[in-house]
Each structure stands twice: as C-alpha cells, then as structure tokens.
C-alpha cells in the first residue's frame, strides 16, 4: 500500500504543477505539497523494501501499483520537460516570507506584552517588600499586583501557544524555503525507474512460472 500512497500524492503534485503553469503562483500550503512529497519519499530504499514485501504477499496488486506509479511519474516528467523553463525559475521564498513574517511579528508582540506585565509585577513585588502589610498602600498594591499577575499568566499562556504554532510553521517553511523543483524531478525519475523495474521483474517471474 506504500506505493499506492506515493502514487496518490504524486497525482496531487501533478495537479498542482498544471495549476502552477497556468497561474504561476500557488498558496503556501500548495507549495508545501512539493517539498513535503520530496522530504517524505526521498529515501528511495523504502519503496524497494515495500515492493519486496508486496511481491511475496500479492504480486498482482504490486503490478497494478507499479503501473499506476509509472504512469503518474511519466505524466510528471512530461509536464516538467515541456515547461522546464518555468520550473527552473520556481522560487518559493516570497510565499514563505509572506506566510512566516506575520506569525513572527504576532509572536514577538505577544511575548513583549507578557514580558512587560512580568516586569510590572516584579516591580510591584519589590515595592511591597518595603511596605508594612498592614498599610493601605500595601493592600492596594497587593490587589493590583494579583490582577497584573493574572493578566501576565494569561498572556504568557497565549505567548506559549503562539510560539508552538509559530515554531511548527517555521519548520515547514524551512523545508520549503530553499526547495528547488529539480529535486522533485530527480526523485520522480528514480521512482519511475523502480516502478518500471518492478513491472519487468514481475513479468519475467510470470513467464518463468514462478508466480
């Protein structure tokens, strides 16, 4: 089933290639389909290992899957080769910047607000150390400091949540930022060779009566 999964995702890559040719621009998430496919399947040995297991379990299914992968790879390569100039100029950096910069700015703003509240709370705590707990000033500051602390804790929780999201998006962006379409082309060439080799091997085994 691993090869079928690859084929399904390659078909989505092919669809987006055609869209890119037409529009010359894709969303951040659509661009991630390209880099995600490459990073998830660049270990080509995993395809070979999956094929070897499938050959023992169900060679007929493997043959069907290999043919589907070979066809999808052929479509990719035909599209790539006929529009190579467009794909050579592929540059995901602007869309990455448009995606990540606002998130970075949002996190910095929330983190700064939280730090200012903590600073204010710390200053009030220091001031309270020099006051008599029975004084009205102390009680007033104590009440205010509790309110400031509560606001800080809420802002800090918001800051932590924003940071987790920002970090996750930054990791996605890092994989895409310097991605080049040629990486995908080289990977698909290797995938097609493997798929065609699987087809040939199964046909030979059939002719020899071994399966």
Regions found by a protein language model. Give the residues of each.
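Long, compositionally biased alpha-helical segments
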Residues: 29, 75-78, 201
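Extended low-polarity, hydrophobic cluster-rich segments
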Residues: 6-14, 33, 44, 69-76, ...
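Long amphipathic all-alpha helical oligomerization modules
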Residues: 137-211
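Amphipathic alpha-helical coiled-coil segments
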Residues: 44-57, 76-79, 83, 106-114, ...
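Short helix-loop boundary/capping segments
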Residues: 125, 129, 133-136
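Short, charge-rich amphipathic alpha-helices with coiled-coil/heptad character
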Residues: 51, 58, 69, 73-102
């Amino acid at each position: 089933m691993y090869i079928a999964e690859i084929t399904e995702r390659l078909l989505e890559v092919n669809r987006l290639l055609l869209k890119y040719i037409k529009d010359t621009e894709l969303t951040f998430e659509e661009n991630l389909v390209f880099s995600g496919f490459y990073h998830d399947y660049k270990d080509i040995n995993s395809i070979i290992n999956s094929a070897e297991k499938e050959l023992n379990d169900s060679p007929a299914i493997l043959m069907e899957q290999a043919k589907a992968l070979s066809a999808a790879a052929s479509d990719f390569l035909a599209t790539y080769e006929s529009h190579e100039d467009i794909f050579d100029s592929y540059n995901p950096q602007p869309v990455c910047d448009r995606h990540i910069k606002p998130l970075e700015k949002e996190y910095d703003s929330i983190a700064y607000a939280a730090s200012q509240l903590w600073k204010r709370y710390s200053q009030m705590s220091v001031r309270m150390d020099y006051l008599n707990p029975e004084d009205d000033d102390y009680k007033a500051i104590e009440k205010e400091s509790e309110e400031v602390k509560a606001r800080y804790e809420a802002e800090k929780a918001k800051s932590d949540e924003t940071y987790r999201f920002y970090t996750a998006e930054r990791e996605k962006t890092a994989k895409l930022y310097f991605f080049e379409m040629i990486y995908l082309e080289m990977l698909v060439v290797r995938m097609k060779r493997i798929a065609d080799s699987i087809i040939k091997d199964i046909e030979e085994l059939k002719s020899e009566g071994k399966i």
